[in-house]
Swiss-Prot record:
This is Imidazoleglycerol-phosphate dehydratase. It is found in: Cytoplasm. Disulfide bonds: none annotated. It comes from the Bacteria. Its main location: cytoplasm. It comes from Methylobacterium radiotolerans (strain ATCC 27329 / DSM 1819 / JCM 2831 / NBRC 15690 / NCIMB 10815 / 0-1). Pathway: Amino-acid biosynthesis; L-histidine biosynthesis; L-histidine from 5-phospho-alpha-D-ribose 1-diphosphate: step 6/9. The lineage of its organism: Bacteria, Pseudomonadati, Pseudomonadota, Alphaproteobacteria, Hyphomicrobiales.
Length: 195
């Protein structure tokens, strides 16, 4: 089973994350940020990852540290669960519609972290959640998971729909990218022999 747990404690946050890449989409999310809980629940369900996330953060200041550190810890757990990446499909992409919004997500489990994030929001908040934290979470996750990740919203009006299309797109792309390709016969999918 490809699974891992990470605990991360700083002066700003105390986080415990567990992920099972070969799960059923079960989740138990408690970040203290309702909208982020919703997005991570979508991530688990659409990637078919089992995901447990507990964040105690300095929400009396704002949501930034909790959102970013959650992305860091989840990225670290994802990378640890993947191990040496033997047999994975590695590359995946998807166009994910959410009502009027359409987002393209492309991922390479490369071990070379990089994020291209071409998504904009017309409003500063979704409920109490700062929309700029969507990018912060994706940046933290991609850097710590070792992913080359491209997220581009082609169009959309509703900020909730745009954010949801980003997270669901990530989920569906990761679901394909981490899938074991039986033709790889346990090899690392790289001419270098490692990722």
């Amino acid at each position: 089973m490809r699974s891992a747990s990470i605990s991360r404690k700083t002066a700003e946050t105390d986080i415990a994350v567990s992920v099972n890449l070969d799960g059923t989409g079960r989740s138990n999310i408690a970040t203290g940020i309702g909208f982020l809980d919703h997005m991570l629940d979508l991530l688990a369900r659409h990637a078919l990852f089992d995901l447990d996330v507990k964040v105690d953060g300095d929400l009396h200041i704002d949501q930034h540290h909790s959102a970013e550190d959650c992305g860091i810890a989840l990225g670290q757990a994802f990378a640890k669960a993947l191990g040496d990446k033997r047999g994975v499909t590695r590359y995946a992409d998807i166009h994910l519609p959410m009502d009027e919004a359409l987002t393209r997500v492309c991922v390479d489990i490369s071990g070379r972290p990089f994020l291209v994030f071409r998504t904009t929001f017309r409003v500063e908040k979704i409920g109490t959640f700062d929309t700029e934290l969507v990018r912060e979470w994706f940046q933290a996750f991609a850097m710590n998971a070792g992913l080359t990740l491209h997220v581009e919203t082609l169009y959309g009006d509703n900020a909730h729909h745009i954010a949801e299309s980003c997270y669901k797109g990530l989920a569906r792309a990761l679901r394909k990218a981490v899938a074991i390709d039986p033709r790889e016969e346990g090899r690392v999918p790289s001419t270098k022999g490692s990722l």
